[in-house]
């Protein structure tokens, strides 16, 4: 069980020395996570339970989520890294990547043949809101073409993958390294 160390709103310690609990359990809620559980598996929508805490000092709430869940994103962080790797490193078309990562088989007419979501992910990485280690350790120039930036992000994230013998393809390493790059 993971507990919060401090309030994300006011910074109060969850349990100050000699004091009572400041962050108290405030129930759970369901959260969707989209994408495959492992590279090459069928993309799916999974529902996970996340734990909520309420701060007795400021009244704010905070949520503890599994490693694969990231703030304001429906896809798992591993699925996002894998999609960027497939597009940037492997050279797959965006529609082919979408079929592997997106659990929805049908799209609206305005989205036929394209998928803009990975470009939003790239922007979030560049702004330090997603895969923070990439932005911190290896930022890229803003004039780079999005596919080149995606390859760069995937390469950096792959470096965080745990060692394995034999070494899996770089796109799989990006999937596996995403949690550590977050």
Language-model segments: which ranges?
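Short, conserved DNA-binding cores of transcription-related domains
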Residues: 1-69
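Short, positively charged, Gly/Tyr-enriched micro-motifs
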Residues: 56-154, 161-164, 171
